[in-house]
Swiss-Prot record:
It comes from Oryza sativa subsp. japonica (Rice). Belongs to the glycosyltransferase 2 family. Plant cellulose synthase-like A subfamily. It is found in: Golgi apparatus membrane. Its main location: Golgi. This is Probable glucomannan 4-beta-mannosyltransferase 9. It is a multi-pass membrane protein.
Length: 527
């Protein structure tokens, strides 16, 4: 028996050697080459955007210098006086849509902010689209709407008997009401968004004075960025998206993805593009791409910020990232041919949308992060015959990381944590991206991102604090624990048999996977 036990490992080792040289080594070398190629593509894209951003600031290509945006002024001093109704005619009719679904903790935020916008009361309609399934919450929202209506605000509370199309379906149904025909523009805010009173005064002029502009997008500002380390990581990623990606798209091609909220659309442009469609989980990006292909221009206002809330639980954040990664990949699959054959936009804009906007940022950016740093690099430790050039695993990633940090300078000291966290999240983003490209599994899964508002503060007052307890099934993430074990094994192998080049990175990444795997990330909400 002892002899047989000794022979088995030798047989396994012999089989491994027979397979490794002709099969595993060539495949791993091919994987390294593919990852290096994708890394170069990502590197070039980051450098390109940084150069454009520097040019925008150096040459003053701000929206207010490129487009006319004179303030809209009424003839009378008191714009809300019924006797001066004609004076308000200079102000276009604006519809404000607030889609919500069981938003118990935050529904008052957006309703109150929308009703407090500085705009003539007879030239704005607030439309609350309530898809809530909880009757108690529906009643609370309706009561809040009636409260504002009693103050003279033109507010409409709209419900439907199904949730077909989810958010896209609610927005589409909202546009069918008769009173919408009188509106020229529509501003959209999710339930946790709180625009400042001057939001319409700063966005509508771009649309009024520039008939070729379809969309004005504002930047998100996060009220709970300091809640936990996970929200700080999100702030870094989203600040880069807004300060760099959106700014570059707006400045170079007058095109970028609509963020689904904190933006104002020209209704005629929406209708020309085909309106809201629910074929993917990114109805906002879908509409933006279709409108862009019709020749419409978009403007991003980086200095106009709208307060919002980041998901602070890991479960909510993971669902959000699945939707944000799966949707664009699926939309790319559906629209690639349509974009390539479009006749209304220039060749350079088509290349930008296909290559820069979709391929590099929405697909390659997710895949290379996970495959290269969480699969291929550890595998080369186990198979020393395959080497990665230093420029591929040191220089390019370092430069890309530094360029990513320009969005949030205040979090520069968290850069290492951000890299490790993003590598973990790339696992879920890659999985979602492949689901979207292949159109399988959870491709159209829509889960509303949970926002806590002040709920946790109310549940956990300082004087009666109890350690939150969670069910073990809610906390443990088996996939992350599996990768933690894999990376830890590779790190130990590198120290014992390799050159030790990667061991520090592998152990740090393994620890990060483990921490997230056991659920100690984000805000823990007690049951």
């Amino acid at each position: 028996m002892a002899a047989a036990g000794a022979v088995l490992p030798e047989q396994i080792a012999a089989m491994w050697e027979q397979v490794k040289a002709p099969v595993v080594v060539p495949l791993l070398r091919l994987s390294v080459a593919a990852c290096l190629a994708m890394s170069v593509m990502l590197f070039v894209e980051k450098v390109y955007m940084s150069v454009v951003l520097v040019g925008v600031h150096l040459f003053g290509r701000r929206p207010d210098r490129r487009y006319r945006c004179d303030p809209i002024v009424a003839a009378g001093a008191d714009n809300d006086d019924p006797e001066l109704a004609d004076a308000n005619a200079a102000f276009p009719m604006v519809l404000i849509q607030i889609p919500m679904y069981n938003e118990r903790e935050v529904y008052k935020l957006s309703i109150g902010a929308a009703c407090g916008l500085s705009w003539p009361s007879d030239r704005v309609i607030v439309q609350v689209l309530d898809d809530s399934t909880d009757p108690v919450i529906k009643e609370m929202v309706q009561v809040e709407c009636k409260r504002w209506e009693s103050k003279g605000v033109r507010i409409k509370y709209e419900i439907r008997d199904n949730r077909v199309g989810y958010k896209a379906g609610a927005l589409r149904e909202g546009m069918k009401h008769g009173y919408v025909r009188d509106c020229d523009y529509v501003a959209i805010f999710d339930a946790d968004f709180q625009p400042d009173p001057d939001f319409l005064a700063r966005t509508i002029p771009f649309l009024v004075h520039n008939p070729d502009i379809a969309l004005v997008q504002a930047r998100w500002k996060f009220v709970n960025a300091n809640e936990c380390l996970m929200t700080r990581m999100q702030e870094m990623s989203l600040d880069y998206h807004f300060k760099v990606e959106q700014e570059v798209g707006s400045s170079t091609h007058a095109f970028f993805g609509f963020n689904g909220t904190a933006g104002v659309w020209r209704i005629s442009a929406m209708n020309e593009a085909g309106g809201w469609k629910d074929r993917t989980t990114v109805e906002d990006m879908d509409l933006a791409v279709r409108a862009g292909l019709k020749g419409w221009k978009f403007v991003y206002l980086g200095d106009l910020m709208v307060k919002s809330e980041l998901p602070s639980t890991f479960k909510a954040f993971r669902y959000q990232q699945h939707r944000w990664s799966c949707g664009p990949a699926n939309l790319f699959r559906k629209m690639l041919v349509e974009i390539a054959t479009n006749k209304k936009v220039t060749l350079w804009k088509k290349i930008y949308v296909i290559y820069n906007f979709f391929l590099v940022r929405k697909i390659i950016g997710h895949i290379v992060t996970f495959v290269f740093y969480c699969l291929v690099v550890p595998a080369t430790v186990l198979i020393p015959e395959v080497e990665i050039p230093r420029w591929g695993y040191v220089y390019l990633p370092s430069i890309v990381t530094i360029l990513n940090s320009i969005g949030t300078p205040r979090s520069l000291h968290l850069l290492i944590f951000w890299v490790l966290f993003e590598n973990v999240m790339s696992l879920h983003r890659t999985k979602a991206t492949l689901i979207g490209l292949l159109e399988t599994g959870r491709v159209n899964e829509w889960v509303v991102t949970e926002k806590l508002g002040d709920a946790l503060k109310l549940k956990l007052p300082g004087k009666a604090f109890r350690r939150p307890r969670m069910r073990i099934g809610d906390r443990v993430n088996a996939l992350e624990l599996g990768f933690s074990a894999y990376l830890s094994f590779c790190g130990c192998y590198d120290i014992a048999y390799g050159k030790g080049y990667y061991s520090l990175f592998l152990f740090l990444q393994s620890i990060t996977f483990f921490i997230i795997g056991v659920g100690y990330v984000g805000t823990i909400v007690p049951h």
